[in-house]
Regions:
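Beta-sheet-rich sandwich/jelly-roll-like modules and their strand-loop junctions
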Residues: 24-103, 144, 150-197
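A short, structured loop/turn motif at beta-sheet edges
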Residues: 104-107, 135-144
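Solvent-exposed serine/threonine-rich low-complexity stretches and specific carbohydrate-binding patches
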Residues: 111-123
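Positively charged n-region of N-terminal signal peptides that target proteins for export
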Residues: 1-4
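Exposed aromatic-hydrophobic patches
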Residues: 126-137
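Boundary at the C-terminal end of the N-terminal hydrophobic targeting segment
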Residues: 18-22
C-alpha cells in the first residue's frame, strides 16, 4: 500500500512539473529495423515511457523554441521520413519546422538543411498520425546531432496543438540562444531511414 501511495505521489508530482513545462518535447536514438510494407528502415527514435493521460502542448509561448534530442551516429545515416502522433490540433492551422544540427566538439551547432523542412496540420479534435518525407536528401555523417521541432506559426482563436507525453531525456533551444537545456520528456517524434554501410 505504501509503495502504491509513493508511486501515485511521484506521478502527481511529475504531472505537476510537466504541466508547468509543457512547451518542451521530443527524443531519439538509433534503434532496431522497422519493416513498413516491403521497405526496411532503421529508426532514429526512442519514444521512452508513455505517460497515460498526460499531454504536451505547443502554443503561442513556444513559437521558435526548438525541442529535440541529441543523437549519436556511428555510421552514415540516410533520413527517409519523420512521423509523430497528434492528440488534437486546436488551432485552425499550425505550421511546424524540423531541424537537423551538427554539434561540434566545442558545443556549437549549425543547421544542416539548406531548405527549411516544414509541415502543417489543420484543426481537428481527433487523434492523427503525421508522416513527413523530406524533399532534400539528408545524409548524416558519423557524429553528434541535434534533431528538433518547433511551432513556427498558428492561426485561430486557440493557437494550441496537443501531443502525447513520453518520459525521455530531451533538449530545448530557446529563441535567439544556442544553449541546449535538458528536460525529461518528449512527444515521441520518430525519424526513420537506413544506415549506409
Amino acid at each position: 500500500m505504501k509503495a502504491f501511495i509513493l508511486c501515485c505521489s511521484f506521478l502527481f508530482s511529475f504531472l505537476q512539473y510537466a504541466a508547468a513545462q509543457q512547451d518542451f518535447i521530443y527524443g531519439g536514438d538509433i534503434q532496431d529495423i522497422e519493416v513498413v510494407g516491403k521497405q526496411k528502415y532503421d529508426r532514429l527514435v526512442s519514444k521512452g515511457a508513455r505517460m497515460p493521460i498526460a499531454e504536451v502542448s505547443f502554443e503561442e509561448g513556444s513559437k521558435l523554441k526548438f525541442l529535440g534530442s541529441v543523437v549519436e551516429c556511428s555510421a552514415p545515416f540516410e533520413v527517409s521520413k519523420f512521423s509523430l502522433t497528434v492528440h488534437r490540433c486546436l488551432a485552425e492551422r499550425a505550421i511546424f519546422k524540423l531541424t537537423f544540427r551538427k554539434i561540434e566538439a566545442d558545443g556549437t551547432h549549425q543547421e544542416l538543411l539548406e531548405t527549411p523542412l516544414l509541415f502543417s496540420m489543420n484543426q481537428s479534435a481527433e487523434k492523427a498520425e503525421y508522416y513527413v518525407t523530406p524533399e532534400e536528401n539528408i545524409t548524416l555523417a558519423p557524429g553528434t546531432y541535434y534533431i528538433g521541432i518547433t511551432l513556427l506559426d498558428a492561426t485561430g482563436d486557440e493557437q494550441k496543438v496537443l501531443f502525447p507525453m513520453y518520459v525521455k531525456k530531451s533538449f530545448v533551444i530557446e529563441k535567439d540562444s544556442s544553449e541546449l537545456q535538458p528536460v525529461s520528456y518528449n512527444i515521441g517524434l520518430s525519424v526513420a531511414g537506413r544506415k549506409i554501410k
